[in-house]
Amino acid sequence: MECENGRVSANGMSGLCVAAPRADPLNWGKATEEMTGSHLDEVKRMVAEYRQPLVKIEGASLRIAQVAAVAAAGEARVELDESARERVKASSDWVMNSMMNGTDSYGVTTGFGATSHRRTKEGGALQRELIRFLNAGAFGTGTDGHVLPAEATRAAMLVRINTLLQGYSGIRFEILEAIAKLLNANVTPCLPLRGTITASGDLVPLSYIAGLVTGRENAVAVAPDGSKVNAAEAFKIAGIQGGFFELQPKEGLAMVNGTAVGSGLASTVLFEANILAILAEVLSAVFCEVMNGKPEYTDHLTHKLKHHPGQIEAAAIMEHILEGSSYMKHAKKLGELDPLMKPKQDRYALRTSPQWLGPQIEVIRAATKSIEREINSVNDNPLIDVSRGKALHGGNFQGTPIGVSMDNTRLAIAAIGKLMFAQFSELVNDFYNNGLPSNLSGGRNPSLDYGFKGAEIAMASYCSELQFLGNPVTNHVQSAEQHNQDVNSLGLISSRKTDEAIDILKLMSSTFLIALCQAVDLRHIEENVKSAVKSCVMTVAKKTLSTNSTGDLHVARFCEKDLLKEIDREAVFAYADDPCSHNYPLMKKLRNVLVERALANGAAEFNADTSVFAKVAQFEEELRATLPGAIEAARAAVENGTAAIPSRITECRSYPLYRFVREELGTKYLTGEKTRSPGEELNKVLVAINEGKHIDPLLECLKEWNGEPLPIC
């Protein structure tokens, strides 16, 4: 049996024809190719694109990072590729000729939507009416939260220009140039926050861009200085000559009947989401460092056997951060000292972080590609096919890729936030954090220092709101426009909710990063204090235990090694505020070493010169006189930068993030003795993240990664 243009399937079943290898008419091949390479490399590319000073568009190659750059109203300028002018003009001319020839076309000679049975020969008037009736948004006072953020509006303007440049929409090139001039002059039309279902495109908000271009009296824009201006002043600031545009047939519909507002905001959201996903991976590795975790969880074989690329990459990135980490070397020594000091396996928030983050990265990456396709698509109706001389009536305005991608992205963001909260909760809990103080309290008196307790409560609040936002938008569709738009994507609504989720994840990331830096500093104090305690105890032991009253060597001198073991086993912050207190474990355990030696001393205990027990009081008295001062001196040395032992963080690949938070942003180690609050410090990090200042130190942590896991050996 043979198949035309194909081959019989391998099992030989009749009637089943498998297509032969050929071109990629369904676009699956291209979609697959777009996912090759590492996620980190893709993020690096995005960052490089974001920083380019010129965004040149021709309709088919716009990137989400470029949208984010223009939306931010920074240095990026927009330029229209002249190669698009001819095809844009051709479609515009076709519409005019079509109407003059009496061709009946939707939105040119007909009414709109469910009322498309109506007819008119007044093409220009029809477009003006379209813009008028779509100006149905509400702004309130303009300061009460009913206005779409300027960044989202700028993103929408850029995306709409790009999609119209492909020449299938019937609009003049000059209108697109005018919108680009508004962008470059940082003049932003005021669009309503709500009012679109992103089904026949984002009709209502886009109509306000059209209203400004056509000089409607109710059109308002925000000038570069933040003041509100009318259409005439907006044109003057932007340097647009020739007055307002009188819309020709189809031009109003071309401007409003597209998905640019939803996909524009989605682009800015995904630029942030991709970077925050990388940050979550690195913070998970730093969490392992300060928790004295076991890096075995990143071993490549574990993840290779699971097959999921997001998981494999997340593990490889964490593995890279932890490879050679001074904290991991120290944690290994602690484990060898006493394997029973902590559980055999770390808890899920650490040990399964690659398995948890991997699928979220895959979702965010897939959503990024989907939105990138959308912002380069022709998404209005009808489409003008000049080559075949016809108007195609379809539904590319349906923004389902936006609604679905944003719902999925928001769920992924919620999952990342949940992991971050679980890690934070372990970090501040002294039952789980392997020796750090409760609430990461950094002061000398834990009764007057509750550290990050308030921050943990805030994190619970953030996480709860984020989990609520994780619920889908797209299952709340209502039939609209006289049941013509009976299914609709809710793309912009979903994008807005995802934008909210991004803001919350930034709050959580800022809080967690400050807490991790606090933990790094506490580990530094811990190591210096422990060293000081060992030195002090050894000095006291040599003074009080080495000899008897006659100067002969005493059997108690053999306690020194066991005393050091007990110091190593005991958490510094379990006793540091009052080391000689009998309510704390250190003195009890040191005494117990001497008591055990005394019990093993047999009959020699009955001789005053050989009794170990007789040495206990002298040993403890000397410790009370010297140990508190030794601990205070060690803490003070860390605080004034003269610590005997340097911080291990400087020997770690995660150091650039710590340096960024502590040195560049000037955040401080928090204690109850000082007036500075956690909120004041984490707000510095939040502002920096909002400004994108965290990107370079984050990528610096990974600059040596070659894109592969460590070899299995």
UniProtKB/Swiss-Prot annotation:
Binding site for (E)-cinnamate: 257, 345, 351, 381, 453, 481, 484
Keywords: Cytoplasm, Lyase, Phenylalanine catabolism, Phenylpropanoid metabolism
InterPro entries noted in UniProt: Aromatic_Lyase, Fumarase/histidase_N, L-Aspartase-like, Phe/His_NH3-lyase_AS, Phe_NH3-lyase, Phe_NH3-lyase_shielding_dom_sf
GO biological process: cinnamic acid biosynthetic process; L-phenylalanine catabolic process
Residues with 2,3-didehydroalanine (Ser) modification: 200
PROSITE patterns (UniProt xref): PAL_HISTIDASE
Similarity section: Belongs to the PAL/histidase family.
Subunit-level organization: Homotetramer.
NCBIfam families in the cross-refs: phe_am_lyase (TIGR01226)
The protein's role, per its UniProt record: This is a key enzyme of plant metabolism catalyzing the first reaction in the biosynthesis from L-phenylalanine of a wide variety of natural products based on the phenylpropane skeleton.
Protein name: Phenylalanine ammonia-lyase
Taxonomic lineage: Eukaryota, Viridiplantae, Streptophyta, Embryophyta, Tracheophyta
Gene that this sequence comes from: ZB8
